[in-house]
């Protein structure tokens, strides 16, 4: 089953709506819930469709980061899952910045998990190989499971 989950911690110094907007800048979720963790809140946005990633698909092209993003996403595959993190503050201004460690995003990262039967197909759709910055192909969005 296709499933996309995006998680972000809201620190006490942050505005929850701004964190939600940072998520919305690249992800269209079906539902969002909030969990209390002491002074912090955890936002969990979910979707059961890859169409929720169409904004991410567009931003990867607009920002001309297909090659770097492809390498990052390919190394993020484990089994039928892709898991990666984005800098929350950069996402808040509508840009993408992949990070390897949580501390690279001072207010915490945005964690993205994509479950799909063949994650390489998802990576090929999101980030096709390029030649001189031009995609070698543009695949249709992978079919829903």
UniProtKB/Swiss-Prot annotation:
Task: Give the residue spans that cross the bilayer.
Answer: none
Q: Which domain of life is it from?
A: Archaea
Give the protein family: Belongs to the UPF0201 family.
Stored NCBIfam families: PRK00447.1 (NF001687)
Q: What protein name applies here?
A: UPF0201 protein Saci_1285
Q: Which organism is it from?
A: Sulfolobus acidocaldarius (strain ATCC 33909 / DSM 639 / JCM 8929 / NBRC 15157 / NCIMB 11770)
């Amino acid at each position: 089953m296709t499933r996309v989950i995006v998680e972000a911690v809201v620190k006490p110094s942050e505005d929850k709506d701004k964190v939600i907007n940072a998520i919305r800048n690249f992800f269209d979720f079906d539902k969002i819930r909030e969990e209390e963790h002491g002074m912090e809140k955890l936002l969990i946005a979910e979707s059961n469709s890859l169409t929720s990633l169409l904004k991410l698909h567009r931003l990867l092209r607009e920002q001309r980061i297909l090659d770097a993003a492809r390498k990052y996403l390919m190394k993020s595959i484990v089994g039928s899952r892709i898991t990666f993190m984005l800098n929350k503050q950069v996402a808040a201004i509508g840009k993408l910045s992949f990070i390897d460690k949580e501390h690279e995003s001072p207010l915490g990262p945005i964690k993205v998990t994509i479950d799909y039967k063949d994650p390489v197909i998802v990576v090929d759709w999101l980030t096709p190989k390029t030649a001189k910055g031009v995609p070698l192909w543009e695949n249709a969005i992978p079919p829903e499971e």
